[in-house]
Regions:
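FAD-binding beta-loop-beta segment adjacent to the flavin cofactor pocket
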Residues: 48-69
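Short, conserved glycine- and acidic-residue-centered signature motifs
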Residues: 59, 81-84
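Extended, hydrophobic alpha-helical segments in both membrane/secreted and soluble proteins
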Residues: 65-74, 85-95
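C-terminal helical "tail/cap" subdomain of flavin- and related membrane-associated enzymes
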Residues: 78, 93-172
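Conserved FAD/dinucleotide-binding core of flavoprotein oxidoreductases
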Residues: 1-46
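Short, cationic motifs built from Arg/Lys/His that form the positively charged side of catalytic pockets
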Residues: 3, 15, 62, 114-115
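Histidine/acidic-rich helix-loop-helix segments that form or flank divalent-metal centers
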Residues: 45-49, 111-114
Length: 172
């Protein structure tokens, strides 16, 4: 089972996309010599806006936010679940210290610490989205090509993409 995304306008009606049209669209995009797209049952479909949202701060009194309650990123950068796990990795010891030891230090720093990673990953997801999803604006299209060329031809560009894509250290 796999999840695929086809770029369509946000106001697209799902009724306009039959299973055959979806498979044809994917086959066009995956038209590679020596490889054939394996079709199957489409179990779900939706129009997903490529949007970002960050709630700052990620704490209000005794309420701590983590994961999708605190931030939304487009799937292009593959960061949503990673961010949620990183949030919980910070929040769990903070809550243990707060509840068991009455030590507020980690809890008080949770939001600021988590937001450093959240903003970095939100920017990366935005960057990947603008680099990989076409724009009808000629100026934006040239910026996109410039970015793609830089990532494909520059060691620094490739390293930056790889570091952000593979994940930042937990303490970032």
């Amino acid at each position: 089972m796999s999840r695929f995304y086809l770029q369509v306008p946000n106001d697209t009606s799902l009724d306009d996309w039959s299973d055959d049209r979806i498979w044809d669209g994917l086959a066009t995009r995956f038209d590679l010599d020596g490889w054939t797209l394996q079709t199957g049952t489409i179990t779900d479909r939706s129009v997903l806006p490529m949007r970002s949202f960050v709630q700052s701060p990620m704490r209000h009194g005794r309420l701590f936010l983590a994961g999708d309650a605190a931030h939304i990123v487009p799937p292009t950068g593959a960061k949503g679940l990673n961010l949620a796990v990183a949030d919980v990795g910070l929040l769990a010891p903070a809550l243990v210290d707060l509840i068991r030891n009455d030590d507020r230090q980690l809890a008080d720093g949770y939001s600021d610490t988590a937001l450093r990673r959240v903003w970095r990953c939100t920017h990366f997801s935005w960057w990947m989205t603008t680099m990989l999803h076409t724009s009808e604006d000629p100026f934006d299209a040239q910026l996109q090509l410039s970015q793609l060329r830089w990532v494909a031809s520059s060691e620094a560009g490739a390293t930056g993409l790889a570091e952000n894509y593979a994940g930042l250290p937990i303490g970032f």
